[in-house]
Regions:
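Blade-level signature of beta-propeller repeat domains, shared across WD40, Kelch, NHL, RCC1
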Residues: 368-397
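WD40/WD-repeat beta-propeller blade-loop signature
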Residues: 58, 68, 78, 101, ...
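Conserved strand-to-loop turn within each blade of WD40 beta-propeller repeats
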Residues: 85-88, 127-130, 169-172, 210-214, ...
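Loop/turn segments within WD40 beta-propeller blades
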Residues: 73-79, 116-121, 158-163, 200-206, ...
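WD40-repeat beta-propellers
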Residues: 91-94, 115, 133-136, 157, ...
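Short loop/turn segments that connect beta-strands within beta-propeller blades
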Residues: 96-98, 138-141, 180-182, 222-225, ...
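WD40/WD-repeat beta-propeller blade N-cap
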Residues: 62-69, 106-112, 148-154, 190-196, ...
Length: 397
């Protein structure tokens, strides 16, 4: 993974049963266009440079880094524990509301590009552009393992939903999987023709999906490393994939691309099932995500738009217009979705109405990553301005 541009930013033995997909190619699609909601008027001129202390909305600001931040992750079990990483070759563990405590994740020799907590919160993985992954014991605050293998920078990290199995995508076109308790490589997934930019386990842990700059989605058997499906060509993306999300039933993959397209793939069959109905963006897609209910999803792009989609019917529910490109998003619950933007602002949107219900100030440069605390009371943003901000979002579920 190249450092983000300053402008654009245990396997179980259950039988291999396949869940039915609740939509298919024969669904009748009626597409309509919903007028986008204008943002509330900016106060004191939106073009002026942000000055700290002027209408800031954060309840905590972490300033321990000395370079741009690229990644943030909140613990799934500790409601105050946060990890951040960036271009200063360092990561930090710190706590919301405890400004005098921080633990430095030392030892990386290049930018810390990705962070991820294990499902139980006991482990934290940090990946770097030097191709090294470090696994940290969170309770003891020490490095438990160093994982090696990839020949290029780490693009992303994901944990198995029920074990200390770690998956990583690399710039060297490969995907690696380790047992982090022993540091043993379990499998290497080879087949992509370019950097592997996104990927994840399905929530049931049975399948791996990966997307690449080669414009393909690959669906893998994690035990055998067999490539079950390769999704490419018409009607799929024509340029590299940038982001990926999988629904809670492990049946659908939502992907975004540099070409401005968003597609839905049936994981079981490997078929594109959206009939090109999700075609509203005009620039690179930077982020996608399913709502907790799976019936809705969101996509954000450099065309300054957040699109809300009705996944059951392939219909646009709303267009949320921004002042600059949308770099990241996070669902706060069934109704509200947060966006991070190139203009340094974090916005909350009501997905039912398309209205911007809150704009958070606190950053002076582009937002690169968002994460929600375990109790969903806090939203944490990481920015190119070298800081992370914490915002209260408990009233938006």
């Amino acid at each position: 993974m190249n450092a983000p541009d300053p402008v654009v930013p245990p396997l179980h033995d259950d039988e291999d049963d396949n869940n039915d997909v609740f939509l298919d190619d024969h669904d009748i699609i009626h597409e309509y266009v919903m007028d986008g909601e204008d943002l509330p008027d900016a106060e004191d001129g939106s073009e002026s440079e942000h000055e700290e202390g002027d209408d800031d909305d954060f309840v905590h600001k972490f300033t321990g880094h000395t370079g741009e931040l690229y990644s943030v992750a909140c613990s799934p079990t500790d409601t105050t524990l946060v990890a951040t990483g960036g271009s200063d070759d360092r990561g930090f563990l710190w706590k919301i509301g405890e400004g005098d405590w921080a633990f430095e994740l030392q030892g990386h020799e290049e930018s810390v590009s990705s962070l991820a907590f294990s499902y139980d919160g006991h482990r934290l993985a940090s990946g770097s552009l030097d191709g090294i992954i470090k696994v940290w014991d969170v309770s003891a605050n020490w490095e438990a393992r160093q994982l090696e293998g990839p020949g290029g920078g780490i693009e992303w990290l994901r944990w198995h939903p029920r074990g200390h199995i770690l998956l990583a995508g690399s710039e060297d076109f490969t995907v690696w999987m380790w047992n982090t308790d022993s540091a043993i490589v379990l499998n290497t997934f080879v087949g992509h023709g370019s950097s592997v930019t996104c990927g994840d386990f399905t929530p049931d842990g049975k399948i791996i999906c990966t997307g690449s700059d080669d414009a393909t989605l690959r669906i893998w058997n994690p035990r055998s490393a067999e490539n079950i499906h390769v999704v490419r060509g018409h009607p799929y993306h024509t340029e590299g994939l940038t982001c990926l999300a999988i629904n809670s039933t492990s049946t659908l993959a939502l992907t975004g691309s540099k070409d401005g397209s968003v597609h839905i793939v049936n994981i079981t069959t490997g078929r594109v099932v959206d009939n090109n109905a999700l075609a509203s963006h005009t620039d690179s897609i930077e982020c996608v995500g399913f709502a907790p209910s799976d019936s809705w999803a969101a996509s954000g792009g450099m065309d300054k738009k957040l699109m809300i989609w009705d996944i059951e019917h392939f219909l646009p529910r709303g267009t949320c217009e921004h002042e600059e490109g949308v770099t990241c998003l996070a669902w706060l619950g069934a109704s509200y979705v947060a966006t991070g933007c190139v203009d340094g602002k974090v916005r909350l949107w009501d997905s039912r109405s398309g209205e911007c219900v809150k704009t958070f100030n606190g950053h002076s440069d582009a937002i690169q990553s968002l994460s929600v605390s375990a109790n969903r009371d806090y939203l944490v943003s990481a920015s190119l301005d070298e800081t992370a901000c914490v915002f209260e979002v408990g009233n938006f579920r």
